[in-house]
């Protein structure tokens, strides 16, 4: 493990690096719930190196904003996500390739920031809707919801492609210029709630899960998008359900992902190209382990699903689950099937938001508060810890640096959104309807603004501007000239329905899906 970088150095690095755009990487079954199910490991196949294939490991990667000159970045070691990557894009091809842009979940896109944008196009002609069943009840879902962030893919042919999964059970591939289809949609057997990952090393592959129990890898270099591999959640004895809300993260040919069955997985992908020039994969399981144990089931009940996305920093992987457990794994020997738990913290409340890691290695976690579920032990711990917390995963003492109590007299509240970090402050909306600015050193709330109830969409910080979508169809922009006191720049309201999905901003355009069934570009 690397020693933590000093705070003073990190402040400088974070301020210098944030917002730079880089060449990015091409994101209900058996409820037995036996927490004594044994983790399984498989010895990895040898790494296949393709001459001339793009990659993120070793060397000195380059990065540059659209139209800018490139900048040489420090080299990094294989299987490591170093501090200097915080706030930067990840990989070798320009764009935004996963939920929150990189393994630390701290890159949100690239400017320029539009001024009072309006709708440039709406996709498709008819609402994207699909039926889905939970607990024997079938309902209709429309559009994009939580988390639902699109991928931005700057292709070598000059086309910018927007890729997203939707509630019509399909992944869509849309031309950013005019909102037309670039490829036929890829259909699955149920709705898609999470965010798609585009391969961060340039291979023509996407990674995503669906409520049809399957985590998939799909190739984009065929005549139509083609499934190459899938993992059925029923392959292990899990709990709760078999959805895949989390966004897969790829670090040096290894995919990390958690499922709503409560299990964490690591696969070596063995990506390559065949003699016909088409991409190939041969995924080998390195680790499969339950994210819960007997004690967690006793404390929190059987809802121990992993709905958050995995975050990676240094040679550690972090995930959280609905039982309130935050876990850190040492993946320095992951290729030999070893990923011991080196950090384990119980926060008490349901954690669906994705952990965020700053350049100093601290972990920030958003937590829900749900008295309507009636779990008294869980709620007591939830109130003690708070619903927004900062953790030190390297200390031998109490890892809780600070926690903020956001409870509201018996009401469901807390946070579903993933925070944004900027210049020593954290920005995040609450379910109750407040947008917060928090001093990351002290945990003090230094600024608030009232936004809509049920704001689950995660904020963006790009070029010193904070952007927040809301559940009343608004998008708001704030200047961060003074990061402790954001000042309003503009508000645009263009939808009557809730914006639950997280937007992405790229080259002057905001791309976002809505619960009304449609996806839009604003410029």
Regions found by a protein language model. Give the residues of each.
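Hydrophobic single-pass membrane-insertion segments
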Residues: 20-35
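N-terminal export and membrane-targeting signals
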Residues: 1-14
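Intrinsically disordered, low-complexity regions of eukaryotic proteins
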Residues: 5, 32-34, 38, 332, ...
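Extracellular mucin-like PTS domains
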Residues: 37-72
């Amino acid at each position: 493990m690397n020693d933590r970088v000093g705070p003073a150095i990190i402040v400088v690095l974070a301020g210098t690096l944030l917002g730079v755009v880089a060449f990015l990487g091409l994101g209900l079954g058996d409820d037995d719930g036996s927490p004594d199910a044994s983790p399984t490991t498989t010895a990895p196949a040898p790494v296949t190196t393709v001459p001339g294939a793009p990659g993120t490991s070793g060397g000195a990667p380059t990065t540059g904003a659209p139209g800018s000159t490139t900048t040489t970045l420090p080299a990094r070691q294989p299987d490591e996500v170093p501090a200097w990557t915080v706030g930067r894009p990840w990989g070798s091809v320009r764009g935004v390739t996963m939920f929150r842009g990189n393994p630390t979940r701290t890159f949100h896109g690239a400017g320029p920031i539009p001024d009072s944008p309006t709708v440039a196009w709406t996709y498709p002609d008819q609402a994207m809707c699909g039926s889905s069943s939970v607990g024997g009840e079938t309902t209709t879902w429309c559009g994009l919801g939580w988390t639902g962030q699109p991928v931005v893919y700057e292709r070598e042919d000059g086309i910018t492609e927007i890729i997203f999964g939707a509630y019509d059970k399909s992944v869509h591939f849309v031309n950013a210029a005019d909102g037309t289809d670039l490829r036929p949609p890829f259909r699955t057997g149920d709705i898609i709630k999470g965010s798609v990952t585009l391969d961060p090393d340039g291979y023509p592959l996407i990674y995503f899960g669906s409520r049809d129990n399957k985590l998939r890898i799909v190739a984009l270099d065929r005549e139509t998008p083609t499934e190459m591999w899938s993992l059925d959640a029923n392959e292990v004895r899990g709990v709760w359900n078999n959805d895949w809300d989390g966004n897969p993260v790829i670090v040096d040919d290894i995919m990390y992902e958690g499922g709503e069955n409560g299990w964490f997985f690591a696969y070596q992908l063995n990506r390559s190209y065949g003699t016909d020039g088409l991409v190939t994969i041969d995924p080998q399981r390195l680790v499969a382990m339950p994210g819960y144990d007997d004690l967690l089931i006793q404390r929190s009940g059987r809802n121990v699903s992993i709905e958050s996305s995995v975050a990676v920093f240094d040679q550690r992987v972090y995930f959280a689950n609905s039982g309130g457990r935050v876990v850190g794994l040492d993946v320095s020997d992951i290729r030999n099937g070893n990923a011991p738990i080196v950090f384990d913290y119980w926060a008490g409340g349901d954690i669906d938001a994705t952990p965020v890691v700053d350049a100093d290695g601290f972990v920030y976690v958003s937590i829900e508060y749900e008295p309507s579920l009636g779990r008294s032990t869980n709620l007591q711990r939830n109130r003690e810890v708070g619903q927004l917390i900062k953790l030190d995963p390297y200390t031998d003492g109490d890892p809780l640096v600070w926690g903020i109590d956001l409870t509201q007299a018996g009401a469901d509240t807390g946070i579903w959104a993933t925070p944004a970090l900027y210049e020593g402050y954290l920005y995040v909306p609450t379910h109750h309807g407040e947008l917060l600015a928090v001093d990351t050193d002290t945990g003090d709330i230094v600024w608030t603004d009232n936004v809509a109830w049920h704001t689950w969409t995660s904020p963006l910080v790009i070029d010193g501007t904070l952007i927040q979508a809301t559940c009343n169809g608004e998008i708001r922009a704030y200047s961060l000239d003074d990061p402790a006191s954001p000042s309003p720049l503009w508000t645009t309201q263009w939808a009557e329905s809730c914006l639950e999905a997280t937007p992405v901003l790229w080259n002057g355009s905001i791309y976002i899906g809505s619960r009304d069934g449609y996806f839009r570009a604003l410029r």
